[in-house]
Regions:
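Generic hydrophobic transmembrane alpha-helix motif, especially the helices
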Residues: 133-171
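Transmembrane-helix boundary motif in ABC transporter permease subunits
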Residues: 100-132, 145, 297-305
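Periplasmic/extracellular loop-to-transmembrane helix junction in inner-membrane transport proteins
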Residues: 17-40, 54-100, 121, 264-276
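Transmembrane alpha-helices
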Residues: 101, 179, 202-240
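Interhelical loop and adjacent transmembrane-helix boundary motif
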Residues: 77-80, 236-287
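Amphipathic cytosolic juxtamembrane alpha-helices at the membrane-cytosol interface
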Residues: 107, 120-125, 129, 188, ...
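C-terminal transmembrane helix and the adjacent membrane-cytosol boundary/short C-terminal tail
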Residues: 115, 181-185, 196, 223, ...
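Transmembrane alpha-helical segments of polytopic membrane transport and secretion proteins
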Residues: 1-44, 296-308
Length: 308
């Protein structure tokens, strides 16, 4: 190519860009229709969520934004009587979730370490992955019935909050294991190899290099797993009785929790004060789950800033 009028020759890419034309009429119509369909699908998906949130907030916000709701229980409160709070149910929900996390998090993290660091590509890893896939799809009532049959019917243990936590472990474990597994896969092999080159053992490499690198993602998975199980109702209905007062003992057969508090007032007349407490309990559960999701986002953002 030669230079004309002191200007550089046009490349093939430039010629292609200059010859680019706007899409034809039919293509423009199809693009507009696709945009409309996608937008409509998004709106249809968001409308039920907004409707549910609006209904719960409008019917339960009055009680939730009072101090007595967070500081008092339902002991001595009848459906026709004003007052009382959800302190017992909030404490019970957090206690059950904490016990569940103490069991599910170590099992999930260690299971992911086994799959990625020790048994990658083996039959054992495929068997564990298949089992986890099955667990991730079982309904909560199946997990509750399994724990009831195993711990209460066969071993003779009593119904308790610990039994509820064990059932929730079966639901939380797949989330923790899968999220940890994905985070461990993202850790560059060069970090492991550099540690091995310095003479560090495999286990210390995992504890000092791999886990700290993936800690942000692992923590996010744990928090999301907790948010997933805190609203489950079937294990609570089957494995423990609802208590209207505060009970800190996880071995007791009665325990207050937000899902069972909601269930206990489902048959009350809409004009009774107890009916408003049901909506307030639902709003409280939404607030807790929302805070956990915000915590997960904060952990993920902090881990990204730390990497930079």
């Amino acid at each position: 190519m030669t230079v004309l009028d002191g200007r550089a020759p046009r490349s093939a890419t430039t010629e292609t860009q200059l010859s680019f034309r706007r899409p034809s009429g039919p293509r423009t119509v199809r693009n507009a229709l696709a945009t409309i369909y996608v937008t409509l699908a998004t709106v249809l998906a968001v409308i039920p969520l907004v409707w549910v949130l609006f209904t719960v907030i409008s019917k339960g916000a009055r009680l939730v934004f009072t101090s007595t709701w967070w500081l008092q229980s339902q002991r001595g409160i009848t459906p026709r009587r004003e007052g009382g709070g959800a302190y017992h149910a909030i404490i019970g929900t957090l206690e059950i979730a904490l016990i569940c996390a103490l069991i599910a998090v170590p099992l999930g993290v260690l299971g992911a370490i086994f799959l990625i660091e020790y048994a990658r590509g083996t039959r054992a890893a495929r068997a564990v992955s298949f089992t986890v896939d099955i667990l991730s799809g079982i309904p909560s009532i199946v997990a509750a019935l399994f724990i009831y049959a195993l711990f209460i019917t066969i071993f003779g243990f009593s119904r308790s909050a610990i039994a509820v936590s064990c059932a929730l472990v079966l639901l939380m474990l797949p989330t923790v294991l899968r999220s940890t597994e994905e985070m461990l896969k993202l850790v560059p092999d060069s970090l492991r190899e550099a540690s091995y080159a310095l003479g560090v053992s495999k286990w210390k490499t995992i504890m000092k290099v791999v886990i700290p690198t993936a800690f942000g993602g692992i923590s996010t998975g744990v928090v999301l797993g907790l948010a997933r199980v805190m609203g489950e109702t079937a294990p609570l209905l089957i494995l423990v009785s609802y208590a209207v007062g505060i009970n800190f003992s996880p071995t007791s057969d009665t325990m207050g929790a937000l899902p069972t508090m909601i269930n206990s007032g489902r048959d009350q007349a809409p004009t009774l004060p107890g009916y408003e407490r049901v909506w307030a309990a639902a709003f409280t559960l939404i607030i807790i789950v929302m805070l956990l999701n915000l915590l997960a986002r904060g952990i993920a953002r902090a881990s990204k800033l730390k990497e930079k």
